[in-house]
Amino acid sequence: MNLNATFFAQMVVFFILWWVVAKFIWPPLVKALDERAKKIADGLAAAEKGKAELELANKRVDQAMAEARTEGAQRVADAEKRAQLTAEEIKQNAQAEAARIIAQAKAEAEQQVTRARESLRDQVAVLAVKGAEQILKREVNAQVHSDLLNQLKAEL
């Protein structure tokens, strides 16, 4: 192989070029590649963190929804229970009012029956006295015979 000056000149130019590239071009290029790799890694980490936060947020939302459903069901159950209690209370009040009205009507009827009996007793006593008067053809004194008349009323 023939080694001539051209080859040595090419070698010198190659080493000078290699030194310039290694000194001035390679470090910024490596730095840019490292920065880009770091940005990509940071982006992937941020994406993973965002994905984890999204899953956590979804879990919190699901939990909040479950709590809201439970609370809503509890409120509905409480409202139904209150409505049932109110209906029972109204029913009991109505029954008590009906019983009171029935008792009052029975008492009034009893009073009317008692008054009617008293009135009938008085009328029967008067009729008995008049009948006895006519039978005896003389007047019976009501004051003198009040015991007899009271006994007659009691028997009727």
UniProtKB/Swiss-Prot annotation:
Is Cell inner membrane there in the keyword field?
yes
Q: Where in the cell is it found?
A: Cell inner membrane
Where, by residue number, does the polypeptide cross the bilayer? 7-27
Keyword flag Transmembrane: yes
Its membrane topology is listed as: Single-pass membrane protein
Family matches, as InterPro entries: ATP_synth_B-like_membr_sf, ATP_synth_b/b'su_bac/chlpt, ATP_synth_F0_bsu_bac, ATP_synthase_B_chain
The record describes its quaternary structure and partners as: F-type ATPases have 2 components, F(1) - the catalytic core - and F(0) - the membrane proton channel. F(1) has five subunits: alpha(3), beta(3), gamma(1), delta(1), epsilon(1). F(0) has three main subunits: a(1), b(2) and c(10-14). The alpha and beta chains form an alternating ring which encloses part of the gamma chain. F(1) is attached to F(0) by a central stalk formed by the gamma and epsilon chains, while a peripheral stalk is formed by the delta and b chains.
According to its UniProt entry, what is the function of this protein? F(1)F(0) ATP synthase produces ATP from ADP in the presence of a proton or sodium gradient. F-type ATPases consist of two structural domains, F(1) containing the extramembraneous catalytic core and F(0) containing the membrane proton channel, linked together by a central stalk and a peripheral stalk. During catalysis, ATP synthesis in the catalytic domain of F(1) is coupled via a rotary mechanism of the central stalk subunits to proton translocation.
Xref: HAMAP family: ATP_synth_b_bprime (MF_01398)
Q: Which named protein is this?
A: ATP synthase subunit b
Native source organism of the sequence: Cupriavidus pinatubonensis (strain JMP 134 / LMG 1197)
